[in-house]
From Swiss-Prot:
Gene assigned in the entry: rplK
SMART domains cross-referenced by the UniProt entry: RL11
InterPro entries, sorted: Ribosomal_uL11 (IPR000911), Ribosomal_uL11_bac-typ (IPR006519), Ribosomal_uL11_C (IPR020783), Ribosomal_uL11_C_sf (IPR036769), Ribosomal_uL11_CS (IPR020785), Ribosomal_uL11_N (IPR020784), Ribosomal_uL11_N_sf (IPR036796)
Protein's recorded name: Large ribosomal subunit protein uL11
Single GO MF descriptor: structural constituent of ribosome
Keywords: Methylation, Ribonucleoprotein, Ribosomal protein, RNA-binding, rRNA-binding
GO cellular component entries: cytosolic large ribosomal subunit
Keyword Transport: no
Coiled coil segments of this chain: none
Family: Belongs to the universal ribosomal protein uL11 family.
HAMAP family: Ribosomal_uL11
Length: 141
């Protein structure tokens, strides 16, 4: 019989740098998960993606065991990196803070394809384009 799921925890952590400090410790500690075991497994799995922020979904079971799935980096993180920005615009409709090319949008969409609900690359590009516009990043051809 399958294990009974008690909780599902969603976090965004730096690749290869998970520590028992917040946000990991409190989120997993209150559910009785071995925090150090999670940190070691997460860091080992994400060591090759250093410098990226990765969303992770941790499934906690009744016997306090866990499994986790690492997703692709958020589109906003990839867009900021492509445009060379620290953060997006405070007023995206009025003030643009950076530029990305259509080719860069396609690259980001290809990276995001496994996690986006889009059926094809063109639809994924439109989703990423919307994220860019909401961050005040201009798309140039």
């Amino acid at each position: 019989m399958a294990k009974k799921v008690v909780a599902e925890v969603k976090l965004q952590l730096p690749a290869g740098k998970a520590t028992p400090a917040p946000p990991v410790g409190p989120a997993l500690g209150q559910r009785g998960v071995n925090i150090m075991e999670f940190c070691k497994r997460f860091n080992a799995e994400t060591a090759d993606k250093a410098g990226m922020i990765l969303p992770v979904i941790i499934t906690v079971y009744e016997d306090r065991s866990f499994s986790f799935v690492v997703k692709t980096p958020p589109a906003s993180f990839l867009l900021k990196r492509a445009a060379g920005l620290e953060k997006g615009s405070g007023e995206p409709k009025r003030k643009n803070v950076g530029k990305v090319t259509r080719k860069q949008l396609e690259e980001i969409a290809k990276i995001k394809m496994p996690d986006i609900t889009a059926n094809d690359l063109e639809a994924a590009v439109k989703i990423v384009e919307g994220t860019a516009k909401s961050m005040g990043i201009e798309i140039v051809d």
